[in-house]
């Protein structure tokens, strides 16, 4: 059942250069120098307490290969939720941080292997971090590091450090022409120190040279919007402004259909393509001040009409929050508020998005009120929910985060320890849950837990449950 990768410490040995442009040996890009030192990275080698003051760790902060300055934009340290200096505190909740790397590829050869290289100078010896690597929101790896060398490493004394070299194969089809992203996060434990991060791949690959704007992604929307000139299927253009005020233009099949002036920050543009009655392939080009940023092909086909409600993701705002703030299919003023729970009891109990497990799905999420948890399981019977930091404890299950969906009125996730898909929805007075069990595992069951971890503890003074039939139970 354990999905983590346990790595022994080893000395980092890499025969690569320190430049940020591709060479003829398959090194596509590098951040830092693989020399077991942190001095060339931002805040290195000892200013870890300035991490928050320099706005590192937030989801909108990034390092853009070919544009960003490694000494200013890539921190030498990444705190974990166990680090007070990283923002975690008893009254502030857990704080997790990300390091985001953006890069553009002009071409993807049909043949050739890719590897992401992460060289760590050291990590916490007392609370080893659980490192998560996410590539283009489609491939994720979780790596449980072993105990590091010394607490002194974070202050620049590397005499007892234990460097670690990670080589992560990138699956075929994950990288794409145009914009790509890699996110490095610490989900559990304490700090780690970066030495070098790089991408290896076919030597024929060409990097995008970012100037005034960088296109993260371009894709056709799975919906249509109504306009005065008829329905449109948006072409979703995700672009970062870099400098100046470039004029962005989008062409479809050789005709300009959209233009705007970029000013600051990130734009997620809905470029209106005329809706079609049947599937067809079109070509697009995205330009900034006339310079081609990205081109490609897009499939256009009939889609359902979009509503404002479909833009909602109920997970937004749930991090570091309280019991009554959670994702799920909640009706306005509903008596039933179904949601996944994954935390221990306490004021933060309920849902924390960085805990990639589920303890149960419970029905009540109001201030000072909670209860009635349900959980589909199979295999050996467990009767306690288990601990938030140990997904192997109790009946809780790890989840596949990439399968999680939380629009208005619906929640879905795959419980990977059991091979079960869970789906939730609700009316004002009733919750509905659908569990899809695998056919190759025995002892399938649905647990009903009346005393689950919640914001405050509570006593069950009077409980009655009776079996009405093979498919129905009733009680209070």
What are these regions (language model features)?
Residues 244-253, 431:
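Beta-strand-rich binding/interaction modules
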Residues 104, 117-121, 233-241, 434-436:
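Short edge beta-strand/loop segments characteristic of extracellular beta-sandwich folds
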Residues 23-111, 119-206, 253-276:
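Beta-strand-rich ligand-recognition modules
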Residues 181-184, 250, 279-290:
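Short, aromatic- and glycine-rich surface loops/edge beta-strands on solvent-exposed regions
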Residues 126, 240-246, 440-441:
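Short proline/glycine-enriched turn/loop motifs at strand-loop junctions of beta-rich domains
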Residues 198-230:
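Short, compositionally biased P/S/T/A/G/V-rich stretches that sit at domain boundaries
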Residues 1, 8, 12-25:
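Bacterial Sec-dependent signal peptides at the C-terminal "C-region" and cleavage site
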Residues 264-270, 275-286, 296-476:
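Accessory carbohydrate-recognition regions in carbohydrate-active enzymes
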């Amino acid at each position: 059942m354990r999905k983590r990768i346990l790595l022994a410490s080893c000395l980092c040995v890499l025969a690569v250069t320190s430049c940020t442009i591709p060479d003829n040996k398959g090194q596509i890009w590098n951040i830092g120098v693989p020399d077991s030192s942190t001095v060339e990275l931002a805040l290195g080698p000892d200013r870890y307490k300035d991490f928050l003051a320099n706005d590192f760790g937030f989801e909108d902060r990034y390092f853009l290969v070919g544009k960003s300055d490694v000494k200013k934009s890539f921190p030498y340290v990444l705190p974990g939720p166990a680090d007070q200096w990283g923002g975690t505190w008893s009254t502030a909740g857990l704080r997790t941080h990300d390091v985001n790397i953006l890069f553009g590829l002009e071409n993807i050869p049909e043949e050739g292997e890719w590897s992401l290289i992460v060289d760590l100078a050291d990590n916490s010896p007392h609370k080893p971090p659980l490192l998560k690597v996410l590539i283009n929101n489609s491939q994720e790896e979780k790596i449980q590091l072993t105990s590091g060398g010394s607490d002194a490493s974070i202050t620049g004394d590397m005499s007892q450090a234990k460097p670690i070299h990670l080589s992560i194969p990138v699956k075929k089809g994950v990288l794409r022409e145009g914009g790509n992203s890699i996110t490095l996060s610490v989900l559990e434990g304490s700090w780690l120190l970066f030495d070098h991060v790089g991408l290896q791949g076919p030597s024929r690959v060409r990097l995008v040279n970012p100037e005034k704007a960088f296109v993260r992604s371009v894709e056709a929307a799975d919906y249509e919007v109504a306009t005065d000139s008829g329905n449109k299927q948006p072409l979703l253009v995700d672009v970062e402004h870099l400098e100046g005020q470039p004029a962005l233009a989008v062409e479809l099949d050789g005709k300009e259909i959209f233009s705007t002036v970029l000013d600051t920050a990130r734009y997620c543009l809905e470029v209106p393509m005329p809706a079609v009655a049947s599937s067809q392939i079109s070509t697009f080009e995205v330009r900034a001040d006339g310079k081609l940023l990205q081109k490609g092909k897009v499939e256009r086909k009939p889609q359902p009409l979009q509503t404002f409600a479909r833009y909602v993701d109920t997970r937004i705002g749930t991090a570091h929050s309280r019991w009554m703030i959670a994702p799920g299919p909640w009706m306005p003023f509903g008596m039933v508020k179904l949601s996944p729970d994954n935390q221990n009891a306490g004021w933060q109990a309920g849902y924390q998005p960085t805990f990639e497990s589920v303890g149960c799905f419970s029905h009540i999420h109001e201030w000072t009120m909670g209860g009635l948890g349900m959980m589909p399981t199979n295999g050996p019977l467990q009767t306690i929910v288990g601990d938030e930091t140990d997904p192997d404890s109790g009946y809780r299950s790890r989840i596949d985060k990439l399968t999680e969906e939380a629009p208005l009125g619906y929640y879905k996730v795959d419980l990977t320890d059991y091979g079960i898909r869970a789906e939730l929805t609700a009316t004002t007075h009733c919750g509905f849950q659908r569990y899809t069990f695998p056919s190759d595992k025995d002892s399938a069951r649905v647990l009903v837990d009346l005393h689950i971890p919640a914001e405050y503890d509570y006593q069950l003074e009077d409980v009655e449950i009776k079996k009405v039939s093979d498919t129905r139970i009733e009680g209070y």
